Amino acid sequence: MATLHEEILRRRTFAIISHPDAGKTTLTEKFLLYGGAIAQAGEVKGKRARAATSDWMEIEKQRGISVTSSVMQFQHGGYCINILDTPGHQDFSEDTYRTLMAADSAVMVIDGAKGVEPQTRKLFRVCALRHIPIFTFINKMDRETRDPLELCEEVERELGIDTYAVNWPIGCGKEFQGVYDREKQCIIHFTDAGHAKKAGVTKIALDDPALVDLIGQKRRDNLADEIELLGAGREFDLDAVRNGTLSPVFFGSALTNFGVEPFLEGFLRITTAPLSRESDAGVIDAFSPDFSAFVFKIQANMNKAHRDRLAFMRICSGKFERDAEYYHVQGNKKMRLSQPQTMMASEREIVQEAYAGDIIGVFDPGIFSIGDTITVPGKKFRFGGIPTFEPEHFMSVSPKDTMKRKQFVKGIEQIAQEGAIQIFKMPDSGFEDVVVGVVGTLQFDVFEYRMKSEYGVELRMSALPYEHLRLIAECPGDPKDLMFCTGSKLLEDFKGRKLIAFGGEWSVGFLTKHNPGLVLDDWLTVSK
């Protein structure tokens, strides 16, 4: 029977990040295929295609994009792998950010034809702030791509991280035939077995005469020159990888499966076991026997048959046991975590035990908030909070059918508690007519879709001219008596805090100037 140390040591928990359409969800599918978690992979797009395993919400299946973060666990090669498949669409940075807080490393998927794109830069910066290992998979080598060396140089120039090519592509587009493994000094030649099945593989040495028959003399000579050029460059440095200053680069095609298995094997070999975490009581060692975890995501209605709400927890230390008693630090109460389960998109499996590095979902009757800490009784430390992004777009929202007020209030409360949207109301009023704030406008579409499909409520929505939110930190009197200007509005959040929405920076200056004693805090303070 494996010891606690051995179980934690074999955990690998990572997030996959990319710009939209770089192939991130397809790569996730192929990891599951090679890991044996699914028998046959489905592509994300195409009218006749199978819906992607990691895309569970109906709107995701319709649009072919990931709009929530999926959590998937599977076993492969002695490792227990937890994949956090993050939203690639630019509008979903908030959910993505929280997911990255739960990862020990990140896989950055880059389109070989397009290189580093805006969303890639944004997500990379979040990873870099945490100094976690970042691996690069240059995808779509089965299409015409840019020069591989040029792509590596662009990653270094645009993202400020060194790179080391772990393998090197042989051809591109229709001529993409395989990769050269620099460590093992051999060619991995691929044959197409159909996109849904594992690619056929032949391994052959660079000096084997049979190689010419496989790839041709010219391509063999070009490869030898490229390998020599790579040899004159940077050395591989494992410590630099672990510190997040050197990114190992792999090439392949998630669609055809070429290069996926070498990448998965190399990644698992190089990346880290669960990392230690900062708390207000110091560093918490992942290998400590005492259980601890934090809530990084809340999701309602993952399965319409259940009509439930799950809190996703990243276990940071020790071992979780189903029937044990735990302590909710923010709630200041002991509890047993109900219906603990691991995920494969919307598929669930009840777990009896889990270890540091694992992600578990527990039934949440409404007591958890994002960022909450759970420990063993007697421990009261807190992990660092997970900030929310300041909403940049606002809409006035109300139900078209006033008879569905109860369903409307339930829906907005549950979806708001998930953190993807912010809900505000007018002071001294109920939630029949609310203001919804989001980071990106696509979240309005998802919100409207979910309210109709999950709660049976059609919405009346109208855009509002606000751009900023400020928290009232100090006010000499009743906030309703403040001198407001055009383009500003007093609001209240779920916690009862008073905020002011502004149409621009000028409005902020006007209010502070004409209301002596008024002190406003920015959104970073609000979110703590």
For every predicted segment, state its role:
Residues M1-K528:
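Structural and coupling elements of P-loop NTPases
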